[in-house]
Structure formats: structure tokens, C-alpha cells
Amino acid sequence: MTDNIPLQPVRQKKRMDSRPRAGCCEWLRCCGGGEARPRTVWLGHPEKRDQRYPRNVINNQKYNFFTFLPGVLFNQFKYFFNLYFLLLACSQFVPEMRLGALYTYWVPLGFVLAVTVIREAVEEIRCYVRDKEVNSQVYSRLTARGTVKVKSSNIQVGDLIIVEKNQRVPADMIFLRTSEKNGSCFLRTDQLDGETDWKLRLPVACTQRLPTAADLLQIRSYVYAEEPNIDIHNFVGTFTREDSDPPISESLSIENTLWAGTVVASGTVVGVVLYTGRELRSVMNTSNPRSKIGLFDLEVNCLTKILFGALVVVSLVMVALQHFAGRWYLQIIRFLLLFSNIIPISLRVNLDMGKIVYSWVIRRDSKIPGTVVRSSTIPEQLGRISYLLTDKTGTLTQNEMIFKRLHLGTVAYGLDSMDEVQSHIFSIYTQQSQDPPAQKGPTLTTKVRRTMSSRVHEAVKAIALCHNVTPVYESNGVTDQAEAEKQYEDSCRVYQASSPDEVALVQWTESVGLTLVGRDQSSMQLRTPGDQILNFTILQIFPFTYESKRMGIIVRDESTGEITFYMKGADVVMAGIVQYNDWLEEECGNMAREGLRVLVVAKKSLAEEQYQDFEARYVQAKLSVHDRSLKVATVIESLEMEMELLCLTGVEDQLQADVRPTLETLRNAGIKVWMLTGDKLETATCTAKNAHLVTRNQDIHVFRLVTNRGEAHLELNAFRRKHDCALVISGDSLEVCLKYYEYEFMELACQCPAVVCCRCAPTQKAQIVRLLQERTGKLTCAVGDGGNDVSMIQESDCGVGVEGKEGKQASLAADFSITQFKHLGRLLMVHGRNSYKRSAALSQFVIHRSLCISTMQAVFSSVFYFASVPLYQGFLIIGYSTIYTMFPVFSLVLDKDVKSEVAMLYPELYKDLLKGRPLSYKTFLIWVLISIYQGSTIMYGALLLFESEFVHIVAISFTSLILTELLMVALTIQTWHWLMTVAELLSLACYIASLVFLHEFIDVYFIATLSFLWKVSVITLVSCLPLYVLKYLRRRFSPPSYSKLTS
């Protein structure tokens, strides 16, 4: 590659997700529900429907009683090799093709299918029981005859449903009334969106004002709602009451909804049902995620195809050596049946059972408590990771915010000077309460102090008011909001919010004297240091979104009548909203370099007329059904101009325990770590340094902000000249580079020891994962804890979710769930490495077992003039791959080359695993040669040493074959487990005991002779001893790296 990257022509920007996705309407049409469209729902009158709606039945089953068996069998036989074995078994019904008893071919196939059917049946029964439990839950329905009980499955669109506290919401509803005095309720949404914080919901104002719930049936009103869709965070609709003069219309948003699957956390609520059954938000979001097929499974499938090719070739060669005489096509089929053992039918079952064992071992590991395996099909992926992509907040850090800095422009207050802030707040409210008489004139010092105190007070008051935090009072573990609020007791107050940052800010204002003690949908109460209660009316709230990066609130001070618009947000958006100043950008950078999360706080005083004009336009925009979000944003932006900058806040999110040694372990294991975060560049860089993601002796190249192709070209050329340096790039620059220089950028970035992407959107995180997979062909692992990490986790080859403060959404979407980032090291170094090596050994032994007996069959047929006559029949051929050898071979899933402590202490062992794969074409060829050697040795030895009868050949060869397999397993095991010993002895005992019942195939009197024993011993020794000698020499002169640590 040249030092200079040529200027590239414009490339079309790729879609963020190339996989086709069906929209909501297409989904509904496929389900038979017709085209989804908006609806009008009359309160309490389900018969007044303008279209048919699905029943409110939850059904997560894949099959029903009649389709279960056909469906399971179809899913199994759509795979070529399962269908191949079915055809072979069916061929035994044709007399010319029969080689022995029917059960010889049907029993192995039946066993494999039985395991699958039983597994599917258990899962289906579990789904049926869960669905029946949900569908049978009883609720109260308001009717003209009073309150009646109704099952969840019988609820219809238009019903008025009463949901009690701690009860699950049965359908998607509009919130009409609540029993809470504050006119709102809290919902627990962790089962819907994975977030553990409670969500505040507000009833329709018109219906909340009615005297009783029964009056809902006396008014003529309806809800106009948008068509069903999958968006759980937004809703557009209107409520209209026709029998009032004039008719009342209210806009409805997400704050007025009660989605099915959420749980009422406070009070009793009444709602009108909007969506049921398959149109529920929760059901429409329950889609099957991308099915991840492990790279190991793909490699095994490839080897199986090679074996199939060998099967066909050997069969054709056998017939060709007969010169295609007679009905040669029947002979080909007979040879395909004879050598069908070349393809091990039990391989998939063994590997699946092995994965179950790996998952069980991971869950039982006491050193990584709380780890959950949600996808048991890809544990081997953990042992082959080359790129780890991690979120920052809540993943590397604790997501426990600590207030560290208040900056007013001319003065900054840190932790050591918070007493000054407290004294300023105290002085303000002390002066107000004393209300001193007029003096001759304040001194200059007093004026300066009052000026500073008022600035501090305005900043603290803004922080105490501008948020979505609600104080919840608990007494003796039982929520008793009304009683506790009367006294505003500090001991039983808990803050509920969707963001840990907001809770940290409100807790800080409490520590300096201004405490949030009460809040409902229309008011807020603050308590001053003198225990005075300040009352504020909430006029409007503009919630935080990832797109806007800010939130705002308009409040009216009840004591003065002043209306104030407060806003806080990220510096990148607030810089264009606040009045011109010369310190915002510089101080934001300084605080970010200290690792602080910075928020900019501003305010704007509004005249009564100004607010009334805004409210009229805002209400009109909210009543719009089409493009509501755009119209509302336009109205809000009209206020967001020339706001007064009050302060900057800095909160610190400390690193989790043992993050530094974990990242060092991953780096030494040859895994490159990329940090993808939404934080600003300086904060992300500081965290990367503190976490030692970037080592002290590494340079950091901060990719300059680029906005077009030419700037990207120049910056990439500058970056190309750097060597062994970490890259830090913003999401905006990343988007430009990927648009014009995707290949060049990824090639350079992959050479970096570490990469930090800041201001990264969720879709960009997923795009980076996809590009790494496409450009490098290496396996990726994505780690995150929040909803914005889900797309990245699902896109990666192996997704790991961290259960954190932001909820369980990432954890539920991941393949593996951990409680702390430090557990990732053991998950990869120990369990990933062991799973990969064990599956490799298991698959090779299963293939070796099949090739050995197939080689013996080939030798036998060749000696007897290429006759298509089976060497072993009946129970011998079935028992060989089951009770005689299955347990020892499967016990390899318990083997390990080094202790767990050693694997953690020397992560270089993981790197060696990536370089020299335990399952490759080279190792496969070695095991093929071993199988051919041992099969030939056993068969020729038996033919040379047998005395007179054919049954002697069978007895000598089969016994030698069983002993060879058991010895090969014993020679391969590196760390003995007591179960391995039991498996070896049990298999040998089963064989010896079964000889009594195998007199049809084996001469029982012959095997008791000394002649039989020495012949079997010699053959077994010749087949195994050379391999043991080679293994010893290799270990002596070219030992593997792990052997140096175990010797």
C-alpha cells in the first residue's frame, strides 16, 4: 500500500442494515390481519368497531397439536445429511438393497430424531404453560351492569379495564383514570424495554376530572389512534369528547399509554383498550433475532461435506474395480450404505450435548456469579475472538454518578468547596426570611457577595427544577406516598428517574440545601434550608431524546408568578442555543479531559403573553396526527434562542473494579479492543487512558473533525504516516470516512492497537461491527449494558450484555449476560478457550471413530473381491457408536490442558489458540491418516491371525476396535476427571457383559481362550503404540506452549 491514499470518487452511502426487514403493515398482512390502519375506539363500546381486531391471546408456540410432529420433522429433514440418512434407511425396504436388519439404520436415525423431538416438545410445553398462565389472568371490566370479571384472552378493543397495583397490563391501553391523588401513576417496564427505572404516566385530563370511574360510560367520547406499529417509545393519537359544549379534544402521546407487559407500580388505573393480540407493541417487538451460527459449526459442516465426497468416491472406486459389472447402479447404492458410517450421524448430537455441558459449567462458575447463557449454540465463539467492541458508560464504568464540579464561568466549585455553595444557598434564603429593613446602602463587599450568591442560587435552582426526577416515599418497605409526603421525610424518600445523571444532580442539590420533596404531573415542591416549601407549577416538559441531546421544562413560581424556561443538555447542541460567551467551549473541554460528563444549564424568562402564544402553537402542533414530531420540534425551537447560560455541571462515572487488569489481559491475549461511546471526545479519551485501554507508551492520534471528502482525504493521509498509535475519532468524522473511504479507513483502523469512537450513534456501532466482520473475516464480540447497545450486540458474532443501572435490555438481547465487565476475562480466557478445544477434540474423535470402522469395511470388501457385504451387522454396528464408545468420547468435554488459574495468568495461551487452530484442514487430515492406519492395521491383523471361522474375524477385529478407541481417548486426555475413568471402565464393562447376548455374531467360547486374548492384544498394541511414540517424541522435542506451564 502506498503512503498516499488517492482521492476517491463519491461513493453511495450504504444502508445501515442490509438485511431486509418487513414493515409493520407487511407483518400484519402476513399474519392475516389485513392492512393496518388508524382506528377510532369508542369508550366502553367494543361493538362500535370500524374494523375487525385480533383476539387478545398471547401465543409464543411455534407449533400446535397437529403441526408439531410434521413441523419438527420438516425442520430436521430440510438439512441435507438428515435427509440423506432417511433415504438410506428407507432403501432397506427394497430387498435388493438390504444389507441387514432394518434397525441397523433406523435406530441411529430414530435416536437422533428422538432427541430433537423431545427437546422441541419440552420447549413447546413450557411455552404453552406460560401462555396459558398469561391468557387466564383475570381483570375487572367496567360495563353498564357494573364491574365484571373477564379473562385476559376475552378482552376486546374498546373495553374499559381496571388494573390494580402490581398487576400486569393485559393489552395496549390509553390511561383514563387513576386512584392516586397526584393524578399520575408509575409503571415498571423492565419486561418491555429492559429498563429498571419506573416510568411516569399521566391520564387523559378530561376523564381524570370525572367524579367516578362509572361516569366514563356516561360520556360520549372516543380515541383516534395511529395504526399498530413496533415503536414502544412514541404514540400519536387524540381524545375527543363529543357531548360537551364545545367538544373537547386532547392530544395523546406516550405519556398517556399503558403498554401490555408493563406492571402498574402505584395506585389503581382505568384504561380503554386500543390494541390486542398480535397488534400489541410487545408482541410486534418479539421477533426472532438473527440466528447466529458459530464459525466452529460452519467448519464442521465443511468437513462433513468433504467426508460425503469421500463416501461417494470410495463407493464409485469399489464398483469401478468390479468393472461396473451387472446391475452396477444397485452396487453403488449398496456401497453407499456400507460406507455410510464415514459420515457420523451422531456428530451433531454429540456437539449439541457438549454445548449444553459448556453452558452448565459457565453458569456454575462461582468466580463469575450471575452469568447467564442465553444462546447455548455458540460457546466456542468465545475462544476465537479477535475484536472486542465495548460501550463505556455502565460497561467499563459503574454508571453511578458522583457530582464533582459546578462551573459558573468565573468561578468553579469542586468537592472540596461545596461548603461555599451551601453557604451561598443558606445566605440567600436567610436574607429572604429575615426581610431586613432598608439600610443606608450596602457595602461593595456585600454587593459582590450577593451577586455571587444569586448566581449560585440561580444555578442550583435550575438544576433542582430541570429534570424528570420524581421523589417516591416508602415506609417500612411498603409504598405509602400520601402519608409520607405530608412530612416529606428524608429517611423514606427515593428518587426515581430514567437517568443516573439526573438522580446525581438532584441528590447534589439536596446536599447543598435545595431539596426536591414532591412532584406530580402539574407541580413540583422544593424545600429550602429553612424548611420553607417552594411551590412551582409545571407548565410544559420537553423530555430528553438521543436525537435532541437536551431536555427542558417551563415552570411558574407560585410565590412570584414568574414563568421560566429551563434547559440542560450536551455542549454541542447548547452552544447554539445560549447567548454568546467566551468560556463555554474551553471549560467544557477542560472538564471532559478530567473524565467528567458535562451538562450545560441555561434559562430564559418568559412574559405571560409570550408563554400564552407559545402554548397555543404548541397545543395545536400536538393535536396534529401527521408529522406531529416535526411540528412540535419546530414550535419548541422557537423558544430555544438567546438563553442565559447559568452553569456547567460535571459528574464522574468511576471505572468498575478490575477494568484495567481485564483490558490488559485481553490485549495480551491478542484481542484488539475498540470503545464505542456516545460521550464527548475528551471524556472518552480520558476514560480510555484511565482504563489503560491506551497504554502509557502509546501515542494517541485524534482524528480531526472532517465534513467532506477532501478533508477526509487529507486527514487519512496524515493518519497513514502514524505508526503504532491509538485512534480517537468522532461519530461525524467516522460517517464521512465510511461514506467515501470505507476500505482505506478500516484498513488503517484495524492496524491500530486500540480505537475510540466518541459521539457514536447506535446504528453506527452496529455498522462498525459489520464492517469489521466483512473486512477482516475475524470474529467480533460486542459488550454493552444499555438499549443503545442492542443493535451492536445482535450484529456481533458473540454478544455479551452487562446487567447495569440502565436495565436489562442489552442483557436480554445478548448471547451471554454478565454482571461486571471483569468477568469477561474469565469468560473468554477460561470458558471460551476450553469450549473451543473440547469441541474440536470431540468432533475429531467422533469422525475418527466413524472413519476407523469404514476403513475396516473397505479393507474387508477389497479382500473378498469387492463384495458389498457388511463386516458388522445388527447390534454390533449400533452399539459401536453408542454404549461401547459414546461415554469415553463424550467425556472429552471435561478435559482441559491447563488449570483455570494458569489460563488467566497467561493470556498468551489464548493468542496461541488463534494462531494454531485445534480444528483445521491440517488436523483433520492427520486424524484421517490415523483412522486409515488404525482401521487397516486392525482389519489386516484380524485377517492374518484368525484361525478358521468368519466369526473369529469379527470377534478379533471388533474387540480390537473397541479397545483401540478406549485407549485413544485415554492417550488424548490431558487432565483426568473421575467421570472420565468411570466412562472408560463402564464402556468396557458394557462390552464384556453384552458378549453373552451377541452369540449370533461372536463365538463366546472363542473369546475365552488365550489365543483370542494375545491376538487382540498384539493388534491393539500395533495400532496404538506407534501413535503413542510419536506423541511422546513431539512432546519431547516440539512441545506445545501449554505443556511448558504444566510440566
Swiss-Prot record:
Residues 2-69, 120-303, 355-841, 894-923, 973-978, 1031-1047 are cytoplasmic. The active site is at 391 (4-aspartylphosphate intermediate). GO terms for biological process: endocytosis; negative regulation of exosomal secretion; neuron projection morphogenesis; phospholipid translocation; regulation of endocytic recycling; regulation of retrograde transport, endosome to Golgi; retrograde vesicle-mediated transport, Golgi to endoplasmic reticulum. GO terms for molecular function: ATP binding; ATP hydrolysis activity; ATPase-coupled intramembrane lipid transporter activity; magnesium ion binding; protease binding. The modification N-acetylthreonine is found at residue 2. Keywords: Acetylation, ATP-binding, Cell membrane, Disease variant, Endosome, Golgi apparatus, Intellectual disability, Lipid transport, Magnesium, Membrane, Metal-binding, Nucleotide-binding, Translocase, Transmembrane, Transmembrane helix, Transport. Mg(2+) binds at residues 391, 393, 785, 789. It is found in: Early endosome membrane; Recycling endosome membrane; Late endosome membrane; Golgi apparatus, trans-Golgi network membrane. Its EC number is 7.6.2.1. Residues 92-96, 326-332, 863-874, 943-949, 1000-1006 are extracellular. The keyword Kinase does not apply. It holds the Pfam family Cation_ATPase. InterPro entries: ATPase_P-typ_cyto_dom_N, ATPase_P-typ_P_site, ATPase_P-typ_TM_dom_sf, ATPase_P-typ_transduc_dom_A_sf, HAD-like_sf, HAD_sf, P-type_ATPase_IV, P-type_ATPase_N. It comes from the Eukaryota. GO terms for cellular component: early endosome; early endosome membrane; endosome; late endosome; late endosome membrane; perinuclear region of cytoplasm; plasma membrane; recycling endosome. ATP binds at residues 391-393, 502, 544, 549, 568, 597, 677-679, 759, 765, 788-789. It is an enzyme of class 7 (translocase). The chain crosses the membrane at residues 70-91, 97-119, 304-325, 333-354, 842-862, 875-893, 924-942, 950-972, 979-999, 1007-1030. It is a multi-pass membrane protein. CDD domains: P-type_ATPase_APLT_Neo1-like (cd07541). Heterotrimer with MON2 and DOP1B; this complex regulates SNX3-retromer mediated endosomal sorting of WLS. Interacts with RAB5A and RAB11A. It is linked to Neurodevelopmental disorder with poor growth and behavioral abnormalities: An autosomal recessive disorder characterized by global developmental delay, impaired intellectual development, absent speech, and behavioral abnormalities, including hyperactivity and attention deficit disorder. Affected individuals show failure to thrive with poor overall growth, and some have microcephaly. Additional features may include non-specific facial dysmorphism, hypotonia, and feeding difficulties. Plays a role in regulating membrane trafficking of cargo proteins, namely endosome to plasma membrane recycling, probably acting through RAB5 and RAB11 activation. Also involved in endosome to trans-Golgi network retrograde transport. In complex with MON2 and DOP1B, regulates SNX3 retromer-mediated endosomal sorting of WLS, a transporter of Wnt morphogens in developing tissues. Participates in the formation of endosomal carriers that direct WLS trafficking back to Golgi, away from lysosomal degradation. Belongs to the cation transport ATPase (P-type) (TC 3.A.3) family. Type IV subfamily. This is Probable phospholipid-transporting ATPase IIA. It comes from Homo sapiens (Human). The gene is ATP9A.
